[in-house]
């Protein structure tokens, strides 16, 4: 099968995200990468659910993990009858989709399709595990291909020799904008906000750009205004975990304040991604609240005295008036007109 992860950084190659083989799913532990390259092995789909909830894989990594988790679920009930297998896979589809609430709708598009594929395979006398793995790779190929178009559009917006600022880890878009920039013979500098508390910007995004030859600088999250004022930032960009049809987007916590600063300094902010058809407004966006202990410590080392409390919303919502454009596979949309994305046929994405 043709794959779309060719010439991608290590982090974005399918097997280095999550992969099913011989009754196990192995997931790259992004919590410790790049200090260590270690994979978490899951022998039940329930362990995959827990790994996603525990942030073993982040950004778009769960899109791969949930599909491979469905293959593992099919393996778990390989000796059962068709009806029992189907019931088990329906439950697995729900559990995997809801491993993290903010993106449950996106994960569900993958998991429920995997359940359908397994049922079709059983009816045809084929191996449902193999069918699910093939379906997941096809889903990855669709997403990577679509995001390549998005990456092409984003690269066109970046000035030659310019400087961009990123937030968190945009996963596929990072790889596709790098490929697009190379094709366009375009070079630029990259500033990566570290993205507390998991440091995805420092650990994941910066490495992808640096390994592909871009001049890359990491800043702490509280240096954003300084960098925008003094380091010649031309463009701020992020992906989004949810893009509502009214132009509101949800992304990693801290994106909202960065968008405010970009507006203050007159720096365009471009969001990349595909709008969510079932998210009509910001009221449809669910913000995941995580264990505040993850803010009070880093890698098990406490940062505060025991009496101190914390909060940890995983995402915040950016209103459309702070967004210069939403970069999609159909071009760049003014956020207030984003609903028009659905005026014409929408390609299957997940």
What do the PLM-derived regions correspond to, one by one?
Residues 22, 94, 101-114, 121-165, ...:
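C-terminal binding/interaction regions
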Residues 109-160, 186-188, 192-236:
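Ligand-binding beta-strand-loop-alpha-helix segment within the catalytic cores
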Residues 42-49, 60-64, 83-86, 90, ...:
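Electropositive phosphate-/nucleotide-binding environments in soluble metabolic enzymes
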Residues 54-69, 103, 165, 169, ...:
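Conserved phosphate/anionic-ligand binding catalytic regions in large, soluble enzymes, centered on
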Residues 31-34, 43-52, 132-137, 159-161, ...:
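Glycine/charged-rich beta-loop-alpha catalytic/anionic-binding loops adjacent to active sites
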Residues 8-124:
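Long amphipathic alpha-helical segments
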Residues 173-183, 259:
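Histidine-anchored nucleotide/phosphate-binding helix
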Residues 193-350:
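Conserved phosphate- and dinucleotide-binding cores of soluble alpha/beta proteins
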